Structures are given as structure tokens and as C-alpha cells.
Amino acid sequence: MANTLEYAKIFETNLDKLAIQTLKTGFMDGNSGQVKYNGGNEIKIPSIALQGLGEYDREKGYTQGSVVLKYQTKTMTQDRGRSFLIDAMDVDETNFVATASNVMGEFQRTRVTPEIDAYRISKLAEIAMGVEEDAQAEYSYTIDNSTIINRIKNGIKIIRENGFDSELVILANYDTTTAIEEAVLGKITSGTFSQGGINTKVPFIDDCPIISVPKARMYSAITLKDGSTGGQEDGGYEKGSSAKDINFMIVARETPIAVTKQDKMRIFSPEIYQKANAWSLDYRRYHDIWVKDNCKGSIFVNIKDAKA
């Protein structure tokens, strides 16, 4: 009997890699290097406070400044998992890896990835919509070919005026990207967008890549299902009761600090699993997203619905 721990390690590596590559928000995981993470469900986010320039004195020299480096401990609030059974009569040891890989790959693609994307986008929208005087949000906009480019450019301008000169990324639903394409009649520039080691050709506006996202992931709030309560057995997520539809979101690439980690996957062979004559696969994933307080001005969201 092959070592099920080896199977688990293979799946963990492949599923983690697949998660980053297939997420529409996978570029946000590139910012996880900003935090300290040693496993488990806690991370430490650094913040730096610096004093500004002072006068240089020719006799006394430099005015002494201070640097304060602090770490804020955050807990990953998203602890999600599922257990699957593959009947022993459907597979044997020789084709278990191939079958289980297909099952877990499909689960990751169709259920895990959309939920993580929707969660991240909703949290970023919540932050942008929470800025005073709606400085980072626009409401009641119906997508229109004649105005969509100006609306996006205005969002970019707002972020730039807030002092964020780094690369911006535009997350847009497919109605928005279609309107953009029709507005420019094929004249839009395209470029390479790198994420998880994969290079993809995407359209650009003002040097900002546009990532197309399904509408079902573009909500200002979502409700997570626990997978066991009546009516929630299917698991996953749904649009929040008070959620609004997002047309597009603009965010500085370096702003969202996202972490997604799969806990050690557990695989039990039919000889070990006692409840049924089946292979048991236990999948668990920690994830969350954070934005530093001084980076809230680097997010802009355009909402289809009215504010009230």
C-alpha cells in the first residue's frame, strides 16, 4: 500500500499552486511577503512610522529622526473545509491518484476559487465604501459604452491624487469589459500580466491591466454557508442580503495583503477509514485579506446600485 502521506503532499503542492494561478485575485497573494507567517491561523503585519525632514545644521549636523517598526497580529478569519469520500469500488490504488486529482482539482476550480475571489473583492469593496464622503466609491452607475472609459479614468485619477503611483489593477465584470472593448473598437492596448508564474495577455487602460471577473464574484458583501445547517448543505457562498453589484474595482497591486494556505491534507485509505469502504479526503483552507490603514485611498469601487 502506497504511503497516503505522499499522496497528500502531492495534492497540497499542486492545489496551492493551482489556487494562485486560477484566482482572479491571485496577484494579491504576491503581497504576502509583507507579513510574517509561520503557519497556523495568525500573521503579523508590519507598520513603519517615520519622521519627516528637518534642517541640516553645519555645526551640529543632522537632526535626529526616529523609526518605529511595529507588528500587528491578525487572525485569519476564514477557516473552511470539506471531506469527500471516493468509494473503493470506483477506484483502486493504481488509479486513485488520477481520480482524486480530478475530484480535488474540480472542487478547487468550481467551488474554492470563486469563494476566495468573492470574499476578497467584497472585503476590499467594504473598505472603499467605508471611506468618508464616498471619496473612494461611486454609486448608481449603469454601464454605458459612451461613459465607461471616463468612469474608469476618474477612478484611476482619484487613486493617483491620493499619492499612490504604483501599478494599479482593474477588476471588472464582463459587462464592463465588453463595454470597454466596444467603446474603443479594438483599439485598446494589451500587455502581459503575471500571476503565480503564469503570464497572460490582458487589455490595459492607462497602463492598468483589466482582469475580467464573473458577476457572481463581484458583490459588496457575501454570506458564507456552513455546509451543514438546513438550506446550507451545498456550502460555498451567496450574495449578501444587503449586497450591491460591483461594476469594477481599481486597486493598487501592492495594497491587498492576501494569504491563503491549505492545511495538511489528510487522506485515509479504505483499510484505515472505518465509516465506509472508501477513500476519505479531508480538505481545509485558511485564508484572509487585509489592507493597512494608510492604504485605503488606493482602492476605488464603482457600484451599479444606489447607495441607500
Which residues make up each language-model segment?
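Extended, solvent-exposed, turn-rich assembly/linker loops in the middle of proteins
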Residues: 130-202
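Long, contiguous amphipathic alpha-helices that act as assembly "spine/axial" helices in icosahedral shell
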Residues: 45, 71-133, 147, 151, ...
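Residue-level detector of alpha-helical recognition elements and their boundaries
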Residues: 60, 122-123, 127, 225, ...
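Sequence/fold signature of self-assembling virion shell proteins
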Residues: 3-29, 36-52, 73-77, 139-146, ...
